[in-house]
Design a protein with these regions (language model features):
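N-terminal secretory signal peptides that target proteins for export/translocation
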Residues: 1-11
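Feature of secretome-associated and extracellular-like proteins
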Residues: 1-3, 18, 159, 166
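Compositionally biased, low-complexity repeat tracts
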Residues: 8-10, 29, 152
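Residue-identity detector for glycine
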Residues: 12-14, 98
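Bacterial N-terminal signal peptides
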Residues: 15-27
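OB-fold and OB-like single-stranded nucleic-acid-recognition modules
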Residues: 32-185
Length: 185
């Protein structure tokens, strides 16, 4: 009578644990690769006053900037320029929609450094949004901004770090890995 032990018993609990950990280590980068989609209120710490925007359904793309502006309603309530930031977001891979305010443009006409803001006209009009509603972004590839009314998705690793430009103070920084036009789902 030839009885074979099941593979799990031959390896022992330590070896099984090691195999399981190795499998998780191989799968983890797949999970880590998807950025966490944020909206602008997520950049405001808990306890700060928030007013829920009254969103109406969009019937055409001309209402897109109004929809993004409504998402950013809590920005007007935050103290500037040293508005508190959400420390837990530091180092997270995120995806955030917003409008580009160019700071640096390459010779090829690509914006390589900019502020990402929650609504069109922010930082152009006074006062600018609070620091926790502005992300200072640097991009090696840059983006050709043909229309300042066009919102964009920006993906990258968010850093909780203060920076200052001639237009505004920002509470967050990011090196953009992807930049593409925001479109309604």
């Amino acid at each position: 009578m030839n009885r074979r032990m099941p593979p799990a018993k031959r390896l022992g609990p330590g070896a099984l644990t090691l195999i399981l950990l190795l499998m998780l280590a191989l799968i983890a980068p797949v999970w880590a690769g998807e950025p966490r989609e944020l909206d602008w209120p997520a950049l405001i710490p808990e306890g700060a006053p928030i007013i829920e925007p009254q969103m109406a359904p969009l019937h055409d793309l001309s209402q897109l900037s109004d929809a993004l502006s409504a998402e950013s309603a809590p920005a007007a309530l935050q103290p500037a320029p040293n508005a508190p930031v959400v420390q837990a977001l530091d180092g997270q891979m995120i995806k955030l929609p917003g409008y580009i305010v160019p700071l640096e443009v390459s010779e090829e006409g690509r914006t390589t450094e900019f502020l990402l803001v929650p609504y069109y006209g922010a930082c152009i009009h006074v006062p600018p949004p609070p620091a926790n509603q502005i992300v200072h972004i640097v991009s090696e590839m840059g983006v050709r901004v043909e229309d300042l009314y066009q919102p964009y998705w920006i993906e990258g690793t968010l850093k909780v770090a203060h920076s200052s430009s001639e237009l505004a103070e920002s509470g967050y920084q990011m090196e953009a890995e992807k930049i593409y036009a925001y479109e309604l789902k």
